[in-house]
Amino acid sequence: MNNDELATRRAQAIAENRCFSKGRLRDEFRMKPAPGAEPVKWYKNTYGDRFAVYRIADCVPMREKRPLTSKQLLAGQRLSVLSRLNSTSGRMARQAYDWLSLAPLFLDTETTGLDNTTEALEIGLTNASGQVVFETRLKPTVAIGAQAAAVHGISEQALCGAPLWTDVARQLRHAIGGRPVIIFNARFDIRILKQTAAAHRDPADWLEEMTVYCAMELAAGYYGVTNRYGTISLASAASQAGLTWEGLAHSAVADARMTAGVVNAIAAYHPSLMLMYAYISINEG
């Protein structure tokens, strides 16, 4: 609304001797009660709170806001960027960025089920770029549950010639080395690896010594939880990151790659904010 339209609207309301609350005076007429103006009447809103209405003829125009200076605009932008850096999403992005600076590996397993006898039957390990570092199938000592088979499509027949855990554990440990490992739902996959080792009477103490980060907790913090468990699925996180699957979903390597993609997508938010902050700081100086 331009100044002429606003003046016409004010004049019409004054001529009609209309009354308004402070909120409507401000929003519709850019006016406020004059010093000493008394309310015409008091009302209650739906919450039981009282509010006053004033005769518009007893009101005065509000002072026009001055345009912000370039310094004020930059200061506002700087505060906005700082707010985003300190938000949950900003902190999760910084965390992901810090993880990637450690040259982590990304691990995923496919399993025989979900319970405390479940074992891994496929392990995939990639780097942050999605390159395969280690990949194997395993012959478990327990049967594959029907629900698990329906998810990953791996049959017991397909594992007839697969190695045992004891055949590949040393190779897996060597492939990981001392690098941190990022896993989507780390608690689950680490439990499965320990159960698999225990089924073969392998103490696998090195599993306890690994530095492990959970990408599911990271993604839930960044994108928000999406289920009744207070977490987020890899598929949902990938969708929100705008990623598409490389290979079949629910294969260990494909899921490890997708986990890497999600972490990279989250991490990318941090340098973009830092670049904005640096630009503002330079121009403020």
Residue ranges and their predicted role:
Residues P39-L79:
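Short helix-start
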Residues M1-Q12, V53-A57:
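Intrinsically disordered, low-complexity regulatory regions of eukaryotic transcription factors
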Residues A11-P33:
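Polyanion-binding surface elements
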Residues T109:
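Metal-dependent nucleic-acid phosphoesterase active-site entry motif
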Residues A150-V168:
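Metal-dependent phosphoesterase signature
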Residues S101-F106, N116-L121, T126-I154, H174-G285:
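Metal-dependent phosphoesterase core characteristic of DEDDh/y 3'-5' exonuclease domains
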Residues C19, G23, M62-L102:
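N-terminal accessory regions of nucleic-acid-interacting proteins
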Residues P35-R50, P163-T166, L248-M258:
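Short linear loop/turn motifs
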